[in-house]
Amino acid sequence: MADSGGTAAVAAPVVKRGSPNTRLLGTELWNAESGVAAKPQLNGAWFASVSDTLYRQYAAKYRQRFGAAPYRLSSLGYDAVLLTVRIGRDWRIGAPFPEARLRDAGGFAGIDGPFRFRDNMAERALEVQEIRGGTTVVVSPAPTGFGR
């Protein structure tokens, strides 16, 4: 279901009524939605997600420094700055920006796991999580890289 977990929870009973053994599949949107695991209609559903392992460390340090939890998508900005620093450290000011380095087939390590840019799109190594009994469980871990 390519929508929020809230919308999927509303639609789930209709889907299950027509086909009780259907496994619901969700998108990464569900990972950013607090309380999605508490929706009993979604029990057993799978959804793609970035790994939260490094994000939890980042969030703990952020909370310690600023006294509040970071917005979940702040990891994208964090990774963007780190990527710019990585590519820019060998860049001579005044020379053209080495944008070809953004297309490194091996990708880059980020807070949300490996990512790379292909065909002008961001590609991420995602894990699969299952909503199970009010929590989420990783059923297939994210790859640690792109073929390295």
Give the location of each predicted region.
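Extracellular/periplasmic periplasmic-binding protein-like sensory domains
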Residues: 5-78, 91-92, 142
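Segments of small-molecule ligand-sensing domains
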Residues: 66-81, 85-138
